[in-house]
Amino acid sequence: MIEVRGLTMRYGRTVAVDDLTFTVKPGLVTGFLGPNGAGKSTTMRAVLGLEIPAAGEALVDGHAYASLRRPMRTMGALLDAGAVHGGRTARAHLGCLARSNGIDSRRVAAVLDQVGLAEVADRRIGGFSLGMKQRLGIAAALLGDPAVLMFDEPLNGLDPEGIRWIRDLLRSLAGEGRTVLLSSHLMNELALTAEHVVVIGRGRLIADTPTGALAAQFQRDVLVRSADPERLAEILRAHGVSVAPEDASDTGMHGTGMHGTGGLFVRGMDAAEIGELALRAGIALRELTPRSASLEEAFMELTEDSVEYGAGPAARSAAVSEVAR
């Protein structure tokens, strides 16, 4: 378990992390989200004892990381895949880490095989691609067979096969009862990997919730299809809700909308109320689908006021539209 309690990090007059509190529980992959400059990496460094807080604390299984005698046996972490000696081989790098933490040398070969680097174990790290360095960093995190794991942007440099591999790996590790904290900018992938999310902005906690619940908070609308869309739209508008015909660009389908298959996007009324209105009016419904925001859309709405450097409203709206498609 990772516990962050009232953590505050200051650099001169700048408050990078502001009274931040959250818990990363075992048995789940927890996504750690925030705009650039939100304080994610600073928080992770504080968990590893690499930064000294102005106030509060960060604990790993109830202890400060710096107080652990064999830290890699308790917690494995990947913060920077490039922070390795390029002149060493992968095997030598992991062997050095194993010796420093009293880890059985047989674990070196085991983790190299686990991350798919067994065939290049004796190549110098300086010749590795970014994706290979990421795999090596993951191997280092797994070396001590720890119960707690923390990864900062581990998907960088990985190809689609590698991304799928790490998704399956992290979920498997969490399924074994381990604590897994994952930071990533790849929202769609994070939505498939993380069961829980912690969102911060300007160093403060914004959300700490199951992934599905976060997206559900930002329900976009209800998609309704009926045999008489024009009459249904008239009834709905009479009840003060927003109604718009479905556009082909929303689904990639042609012939939609009031003059096609009867698709309407309804805002301001939930699916149950729409169904009751249609029933009373004698209008048969073909589809009634609440549409929640994607994780990326929910994240952008949540952090809109916490972005240090970002595009204007029009550009953000266009970006969300592209993501939604």
Predicted features and spans:
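ABC transporter nucleotide-binding domain
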Residues: I166-V266
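Short, flexible cytosolic linker that couples an ABC transmembrane/permease module to its adjacent nucleotide-binding
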Residues: A110, G212-A216, G312-A314
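Hydrophobic C-terminal alpha-helix "anchor/cap" residues
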Residues: L142, L236-R237, A278
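Conserved NTP-handling cores and scaffolds of large molecular machines
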Residues: N101, G177, G240, S292, ...
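C-terminal coupling/interaction segments
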Residues: R267-R325
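ABC transporter nucleotide-binding domains
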Residues: I2-V4, M9-G201, A207
